[in-house]
From Swiss-Prot:
Modified residues (Phosphoserine): S86, S205, S332, S337, S446, S447, S608, S625, S630
Superkingdom: Eukaryota
Residue list for modification Phosphothreonine: T701
Known outcome of mutating L61A: Abolishes self-association. Reduces expression in erythroid cells
Residues that coordinate or bind Zn(2+) 2: C744, C747, H760, H764
BP GO annotations: cellular response to L-glutamate; negative regulation of axon extension; negative regulation of branching morphogenesis of a nerve; negative regulation of collateral sprouting; negative regulation of dendrite development; negative regulation of dendrite extension; negative regulation of neuron projection development; negative regulation of neuron remodeling
Low complexity bias spans: 682-696
Skewed-composition ranges (Gly residues): 706-720
Protein's recorded name: BCL11 transcription factor A
Protein encoded by which gene: BCL11A
Annotated residues for binding of Zn(2+) 1: C48, C51, H66, C71
Comp. bias intervals (Basic residues): 1-12, 421-430
Lineage: Eukaryota, Metazoa, Chordata, Craniata, Vertebrata
Positions with a binding annotation for Zn(2+) 3: C772, C775, H788, H792
Subunit-level organization: Homotetrameric; self-associates via C2HC-type zinc finger domain. Interacts with MTA2, a component of the nucleosome remodeling and deacetylase (NuRD) repressor complex. Interacts (via its C2H2-type zinc finger domains 4, 5 and 6) with promoter region of gamma-globulin. Interacts with NR2F1, PIAS3, NR2F2 and NR2F6. Isoform 1, isoform 2 and isoform 3 form homodimers and heterodimers. Isoform 2 interacts with TBR1.
Length: 835
């Protein structure tokens, strides 16, 4: 038995049933009394909140049955009139003991009370006390232990629909003002009568729970009326205690396990005060209260609610509301749960929680997170920065002098693999019978096209070397490479790589060693010309000797194709001077199969059989595949780089002047019916000695273009080559349907447009019309001059000037090379940088 029951027995006995309120029994000399209506021993009482009947605790079942039978006793409003007036706030602070409600039931009894009856009219203080106890609180009591009667704690319940609606009215016991909502009753009690029931947050600040609340906080309250069936209004502050479910035991368990320890005391549900489904519940009193106390009403609407979801919550509508509000700073990450963040009401500057997780800084205050900037590669010697590490490695070698790429055929060494490949071209015109090697040890020929074998690729590269040797031995008038110019080009290209990313060379400038070679086409010629081998003298045997040295004679299709060329050349040799042109194939035929066999004449003059054999071999082995749809036939540019110059002839020193004259004439004529019109006519077109008998303009045929050549572009598109002798007599200009006009007259390479062909011709003629005004650099293409000019300075970049010749450079390493090349006897001064 408790100390209170032993020392101070209660006034009521087991048999004394009093219809009066329990508060009237307590006297002024008992300020520290504990729970109300607790008789001595087991005579603890249960008081009906409707009729104020007292039941012994042992008769709890009778009490429950009494409640089930819908007690129709007197209204509690009449009893509440007798209560004393409201105490002062000082008396409220003195009270420290929790007050327990008069209706005491155990959690097991909640199941029995789960089906609430209609017409129940409990006193509102019990409801408030019980609900406050769910939150770990209890109603304030006076210094004498009596419940404070001030905050209008009376309520009447409608006789019907109790499980679906709140009490029909709430009446303040002090001023008798009725309210239809408990929330407005609480506002009235706090603002009008001075009670501290809930905390008010300042404008714009989140509500924080109050730690110390006056007038007694209780942690236990065994009594609990059947409130699970009494649905409190959604705009009621007690709505935060509502838990989905129909059983009060489940509700109490959820309340103990799910509620955060320190949430706000009371707060209205979000936006429900404007819900059209609930607006009719707001009576005139409530609207008047909102008008009378606008500040309190506005503050209440800003309170953060407990994030428990009412059963009638419309999730789809709420989500649409949240999705529409996207212009806000993110919420704090310290929310109890995602569901609570989802249901959190947002102020005008807030952001939906599902859009704000994880929280991000506002856009105006900090930029969005980005990846760390890429570290620039800078040279340790001159400070120049590069985008790629590979460019820095190559540039660093210009300072260190390292030259890791060495030529296997000479003492040349360079800093880049591309330079070594370019250098290896110089060996193509020398007398080396071996295939040159690049820096990687492989053949300079690129990989063969898809569909060809490795054998073909290696054979084609070897054949290229053989033809180059054959040309160098039999063409003493071949224009040699200019070593100084080549070195200058190397320097220029290195500077361009340092200035910018390496650009793709145009099709006319790219050195492409790979070329398509069809074994089927070779076999076709092989089968069509067996036994047609004719000896043509010692010079013609020079190439077979080289082929034997290169083990090419063991490859049957190479050997027989070569002998077939010699046989055809011998049979048609006497027709060379009579024919000025040869009939060409259809213009729409495959460009990649457009090579012809040189018939041994140039400008109507005969040439040595060996020279024609070399040209015939190169053309013969490069015939397209039988199918016009093969990858070889689709190539716009023939992939062969034999760079065959015009064969040896009289007046070799006058060749280029004749070509330039013919080129100028072709620019003026632009006759579409001329096979080389529109800047593509023969370089020898202006020679008067080639006029025909009838006075018509005759164009001499470039090497490999005369009659009797084997056409690689048959009209059937089969790709098979057929010996063809021109039908029309001399003097007839080439037809519109003749040979493609974008084919090089020297090497037979086909180009996509005439501008590329024009630039390509300069590689044969040596013409360099574009000259730098600051140095002696000259080139054949305007774009190269443009790139070269960047080496002399760019807008916004530092300029380095030579102290001796005052030549500007945009890259310091270029100045170093200039000094080494032109002023090697001078010492380079470091203070030469100018802005």
């Amino acid at each position: 038995m408790s100390r209170r029951k032993q020392g101070k027995p209660q006034h009521l006995s087991k048999r004394e049933f009093s219809p009066e309120p329990l508060e009237a029994i307590l006297t002024d000399d008992e300020p520290d009394h504990g729970p109300l209506g607790a008789p001595e021993g087991d005579h603890d009482l249960l008081t009906c909140g409707q009729c104020q009947m007292n039941f012994p605790l042992g008769d709890i079942l009778i009490f429950i049955e009494h409640k089930r039978k819908q007690c129709n006793g007197s209204l509690c409003l009449e009893k509440a009139v007798d209560k004393p007036p409201s105490p002062s706030p000082i008396e409220m602070k003195k009270a420290s003991n929790p007050v327990e409600v008069g209706i005491q039931v155990t959690p097991e009894d909640d199941d029995c009370l789960s089906t609430s009856s209609r017409g129940i009219c409990p006193k509102q203080e019990h409801i408030a006390d019980k609900l406050l106890h769910w939150r770990g609180l209890s109603s304030p009591r006076s210094a004498h232990g009596a419940l404070i009667p001030t905050p209008g704690m009376s309520a009447e319940y409608a006789p019907q629909g109790i499980c679906k609606d709140e009490p029909s009215s709430y009446t303040c016991t002090t001023c008798k003002q009725p309210f239809t909502s408990a929330w407005f009753l609480l506002q009235h009690a706090q603002n009008t009568h001075g009670l501290r029931i809930y905390l008010e947050s300042e404008h714009g600040s989140p509500l924080t729970p109050r730690v110390g609340i006056p007038s007694g906080l209780g942690a236990e309250c065994p009594s609990q009326p059947p409130l699970h069936g009494i649905h409190i209004a959604d705009n009621n502050p007690f709505n935060l205690l509502r838990i989905p479910g129909s059983v009060s035991r489940e509700a109490s368990g959820l309340a103990e396990g799910r509620f955060p320890p320190t949430p706000p005391l009371f707060s209205p549900p979000p936006r429900h005060h404007l819900d059209p489904h609930r607006i009719e519940r707001l009576g005139a009193e409530e609207m008047a209260l909102a008008t009378h106390h606008p500040s309190a009403f506005d503050r209440v609407l800003r309170l953060n609610p407990m994030a428990m979801e009412p059963p009638a919550m419309d999730f789809s509508r709420r989500l649409r509301e949240l999705a529409g509000n996207t212009s806000s700073p993110p919420l704090s990450p310290g929310r109890p749960s995602p569901m609570q963040r989802l249901l959190q009401p947002f102020q005008p500057g807030s952001k939906p929680p599902f859009l704000a997780t994880p929280p991000l800084p506002p856009l105006q205050s900090a930029p969005p997170p980005s990846q760390p900037p890429v570290k620039s590669k800078s040279c340790e010697f001159c400070g120049k920065t590069f985008k790629f590490q590979s460019n820095l490695v190559v540039h660093r070698r210009s300072h260190t002098g390292e030259k890791p790429y060495k030529c296997n055929l000479c003492d040349h060494a360079c800093t880049q693999a591309s330079k070594l490949k370019r250098h290896m071209k110089t060996h193509m015109h020398k007398s080396s019978p071996m295939t040159v090697k690049s820096d990687d040890g492989l053949s300079t020929a690129s990989s063969p096209e898809p569909g060809t074998s490795d054998l073909v690729g290696s054979a084609s590269s070897a054949l290229k070397s053989v033809v180059a040797k054959f040309k160098s031995e039999n063409d003493p008038n071949l224009i040699p490479e200019n070593g100084d110019e080549e070195e200058e080009e190397d320097d220029e290209e290195e500077e361009e790589e340092e200035e910018e990313e390496e650009e793709e060379l145009t099709e006319s400038e790219r050195v492409d060693y790979g070329f398509g070679l069809s074994l089927e086409a070779a076999r076709h010629h092989e089968n069509s010309s067996r036994g047609a081998v004719v000896g043509v003298g010692d010079e013609s045997r020079a190439l077979p000797d080289v082929m034997q040295g290169m083990v090419l004679s063991s490859m049957q299709h190479f050997s027989e194709a070569f002998h077939q060329v010699l046989g055809e050349k011998h049979k048609r040799g006497h027709l060379a001077e009579a024919e000025g042109h040869r009939d060409t194939c259809d213009e729409d035929s495959v460009a990649g199969e457009s090579d012809r066999i040189d018939d041994g004449t140039v400008n109507g003059r005969g040439c040595s059989p060996g020279e024609s054999a070399s040209g015939g071999l190169s053309k013969k082995l490069l015939l397209g595949s039988p199918s016009s749809l093969s990858p070889f036939s689709k190539r716009i540019k023939l992939e062969k780089e034999f760079d065959l110059p015009p064969a040896a002839m009289p007046n070799t020193e006058n060749v280029y002047s004749q070509w330039l004259a013919g080129y100028a004439a072709s620019r003026q004529l632009k006759d579409p019916f001329l096979s080389f019109g529109d800047s593509r006519q023969s370089p020898f077109a202006s020679s008067s000695e080639h006029s025909s008998e009838n006075g018509s303009l005759r164009f001499s045929t470039p090497p490999g273009e005369l009659d009797g050549g084997i056409s690689g572009r048959s009209g059937t598109g089969s790709g098979g080559s057929t010996p063809h002798i021109s039908g029309p007599g001399p003097g007839r200009p080439s037809s519109k349907e003749g040979r493609r006009s974008d084919t090089c007259e020297y090497c037979g390479k086909v180009f996509k447009n005439c501008s590329n062909l024009t630039v390509h011709r300069r590689s044969h003629t040596g013409e360099r019309p574009y000259k730098c005004e600051l140095c002696n650099y000259a080139c054949a293409q305007s774009s190269k001059l443009t790139r070269h000019m960047k080496t002399h300075g760019q807008v916004g970049k530092d300029v380095y000037k030579c102290e001796i010749c005052k030549m500007p450079f945009s890259v310091y390493s270029t100045l170093e090379k200039h000094m080494k090349k032109w002023h090697s006897d001078r010492v380079l001064n470091n203070d030469i940088k100018t802005e």
